[in-house]
Amino acid sequence: MSRCIERDRRFYDFLVKTRLPMTITDVAHMFYPSPSGNERSSITIAQRRCRELKKMQYIEISNRSFGSCNYYYVGSKPSERSLRHRLLMSHVISTISCNGFNIIDVETEKSFMDGELRSDIYMIIEYNKTKYCLLCEVDLTKPFNTEGYTKLLNKVMKGEIKFPHQLILLSVSDMKLEDSDIKKYITQVDTELKSFNKFLWKFIK
């Protein structure tokens, strides 16, 4: 990638590692923010860099738009069935990244308990010099996996499963969480992320 700038490399590495598609807005916010905070400038830069990366055959650009935006990806094109879900996953990651969090590591579809539970997003994040492990479920058509996460938390509390930092659970869904013993441990925001501040407030002390 000799003609790529550092931000191109980070963008490309993210796509390769997560296999998530991204809209140009999320690409711009996460990888090409304007120093002045001008969103239009940021998007223009991101569009130019994406065209260059496409020419160098590092990324692909969708032939047709999702809503009003093209999306960008590497490898196999996302299926129509999974596209909205996977775009929302990348949107969640981008939103977290742009709200004062340092994303140290990110994995998608991470399995726990010998495959009994598969988390949509696993991240190690840092906020105000404190690191956390974040498990995020993005649910568009099904309720939050209360049973699976109850088992996981029970094992964590017993010391059978260990995380390197404090564990945070995030649900992104428009379906209400069912009443359960673990409900108090879960922060839920809507799929448009209008209520994202509910998540952010957990870290503001």
Feature names for model-found ranges:
Residues L15, F31, C50-Q57, V92-G100, ...:
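Hydrophobic, Leu/Ile/Phe/Ala-enriched alpha-helical segments that form helix-helix packing faces
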Residues I45-Q47, R86-V92, T146-V156:
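Well-ordered, non-membrane alpha-helical segments in soluble/globular domains
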Residues V138-Q188:
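Catalytic cores of nucleic-acid endonucleases
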Residues M1-K77:
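Nuclease-adjacent, charged terminal/linker segments that flank catalytic cores
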